[in-house]
Structure formats: structure tokens, C-alpha cells
């Protein structure tokens, strides 16, 4: 059932409580509720997405930025980046899967294998994770030629039809620039290739968000309770450091209510809000908690550390001909290419948008247009690391988000971005784009040297809105990994995390489908633990009766 007024909830005790109805949280809650013997509550601060066309209709996604469905987090002043930038975080059921452009990728094998081999995240290699991608999807490409794809999962993946003539010309131009057409999500990592994306969208234009895919079908299920408009204030622990529930605040009157979990709580509020809630609950760097007068439950120095993102630049062009008036989601093509030899994954990705993108350029005086296109190079494995910190002990205050863009000592991130600007220009200048590429609006042909391009990037870069890694999983003995490989918060019991914050290293691609996969994996881990406890209890009972 769905409850948007906590006063109408009489029974406030559940077997499992999932805090955050986003990309992973919805998957966790739905999978746990498949067992009719357990009760599951899913708590979301934002509203229900059902009946909200600007959320459900994928081609309207850009309307949601800086809207009432966006937490809209400013970032701290950047020493080497764009301090005006804001991090869009969705405030609605489905989380960022209800707020994004639904670009759908399986993470490359190399990324997942590295999680295990380099960071000690046992059980997260590609061999273990890829069956979860298959389980969650109904993929248009599934069939005898692609047996790795799923055909019965809740999340619908489709191929963007090549209807945009500028996009088709752009892919021809990529080939002329040495970047061939390549199919995505085949199981082979595309190091150098371009094509129209796969997206998680249904045939009628509805986004296949985690809410649409996992929650809409089960809202009326007897053992499932959806609670919206309720913001988590603090996690609750008993004297043995077991997480027994969560204190939530209703948006109407600001009253605090307590929900109790008999078994486990799963925290799934994203790479910015998950470390915030842990720290408000006494789990985090001890010195930082003490600064804010918060009693330390667990000194966990890795909470809020290791913030990673995909920083993004933009090259904008006027179009010589009218651009498309309709699109699946306006950013339909991806381009991958390496900037140096010998890489097993591309260090540069670009998105092609059939729209202008002047969010960060107009304020600096760069010209704009209403008929143009954009190429947005981004750094797939940025080496800069940032932090998320508390602004105060007040749960209502936005956290301090400091991505520290372009601060890696080797200068890798800026080097790749400059190379990306140059590659975007090279592609747009190919003969195949002669009928489309007009004046370069930004950075403009005047910017040619590395120093000029670096100055442009620092002023105008954006984010692909992919923050990860702030509560990473890792080896049990690694004190900078707040989670063990089973997503359990170290130092307490009864608490797991499932969202983008758990990634020990960023993935090369758009991460949203991987975040859903993390939700699937978390549910499996919980069910396995429950099955083990049941088996042990049965054995103990049998021994007692013998």
C-alpha cells in the first residue's frame, strides 16, 4: 500500500526498512517483498511519481533540473573548477532513474573485476555481477544472437532508433575521424567506438525507472508499504550497536516518527545523502563528528571520502539546418575513444545532444542559439577525489559537497578533457558534418592553446551527475572502506548500504543500470543471510528436540 500521511500508518514495525526509493532502493525493496512471509517498508522523501507526466515522460527530463523534484545541491568553491556548478539529485520516487536521460549500460568487465581484485570487494567481479544485469532487464536485443541479455526482467532496454539525421551524420564523421560504429552492451568493452545508445524506456515513451519497473507493479502488495514525503532524520541503534530503525520527519508538520526494523535497515539515499545520514547517526570520521557535537558511534574515516564523478566539458555549434523537433531524450549518441595507447577501457567519452547546452557558458558571455547541437566530452576515470561533509548537525541543512575537480596531482583529468575538446572539434569538422556544423559557439575558434582551453574548462565545465564512492565497499580490514563486500556497515549490525556510494571505483559508462544491479545484489545478500539464519535455527531446534 502507499501512504503519504504517516498518521495513517498504525503498524510501524517491519522486517525490513529501505530508506530511499531511488535506483537501488526500489530494487532492494521489490526483491525482498517477493517473500510473502516478510514485511517491507520503502521510505522516500520525495513524492510518488505515478501520474506525474514530467517525471514519467522521458523526453521531458531536462525540465526536472533545478525543479521541485531536485535537491539541487550547490558545490563548495573549487580551486581548479567551476564553483557555480550544482549537483542535481532527484527528490521523487525512482531517484535519479526518474530524473536522468536513461542511458543504459552494463559496466565493463574490467571495471567490475577491478572492484574485486584491487579493492577487495569479493563477489563483485563481472562473472558474479553480469547475471544480475540479465535478471533485471528485458532487452530489445535479447535472443539467440545475444544470450547474455535478459528478456523477462522489470527494466525495459531499447535501442534508440537512428531517426536524427544530424546524429547519423555525426556517426559517419566519427568513422572519418577513426572512431568506428560499435554496438553497446554486447559483453565486449568498447574502447574506440560510437553509436546510438540503449536506453531504459518503454515503447510508449515512459521511462523505465526503478520506480516504474520495480515499485508500480507491487504498490498494492499486502506485505509492502510505500511511504512518501518522509525524510530520514537519523538511524536508530540499540545498546549493542544494532540498527533497529530510523527516525523520519513528515513534510507537513515536521513531526518526528520512528519506524522499527525487526531484521535489517538498508540505506539507499545516494552518494551525497547516504554519507550525510551516516554521519548524522554517529558513523563517520570521529574528528568531523566531534566538530558538530555528534556522539561518535563508529569512527569510520572513509565515510564521505573518495567522492568520484564524471566531469564534463561542452563544445557547442550552431546548426546550418533545422535540428530535430522530437527525440527519445535529446542525448542519443555516445562516443568512446582513448587519448593514449594501451588502455583496456576508454578514458574519454562524449555525449551528443541535439540541443544547445549553455547552462555554464552563457554567464561567461559565450554566444548561444536555439538551433544547435553539443558534444560533451567527459573523463571516464577521473583521478581527482572529493568529499561530502556535514554543514551542521541539522538534518535539514544541505551537506558540503566538494568534488575537487581537476585537482589530481598528475593533471590527468585536465589532460583528458583538453583532448576531448580537440576530438569533438575534429569530429564536427569532418566532411560528413559539412551540411550541419555551423559556427562554434563555445569555446569558440579563438581558444586554441592548451592554456586557453584549460581556462575555458575551469570556468564552464559541468558534471554528468554521476557522483559515486563516498561509502565504498572493500576488504574487511580496510579502514577506509566503511562497508564490507556484503554491503554491511562495519562496526554495527543490521545496517547495509545499497546505492552509488558503495562503488569503490567509478565505472567507465553511465552508471544508473549498475546502481540498479547493486540493489539486486543487496537483496540477494540479505535473502542469503536470512536463509542461513533460518537453516541454523532449524538445525538448533532439531538438535533440541532430539
Curated annotation (Swiss-Prot):
Main enzyme class: oxidoreductase
Protein name as it appears in the record: Choline oxidase
Effect recorded for residue 464 to A: Results in a 2-fold decrease in the limiting rate constant for flavin reduction. Has no effect on substrate binding
Pfam families: GMC_oxred_C, GMC_oxred_N
Biological process per Gene Ontology, one example term: glycine betaine biosynthetic process from choline
Modified residues (Tele-8alpha-FAD histidine): 99
Transmembrane segment boundaries: none
Lineage: Bacteria, Bacillati, Actinomycetota, Actinomycetes, Micrococcales
Effect of residue 101 to A: Increased efficiencies in the oxidative half-reactions and decreased efficiencies in the reductive half-reactions
InterPro entries, per database record: FAD/NAD-bd_sf (IPR036188), GMC_OxRdtase (IPR012132), GMC_OxRdtase_N (IPR000172), GMC_OxRtase_C (IPR007867)
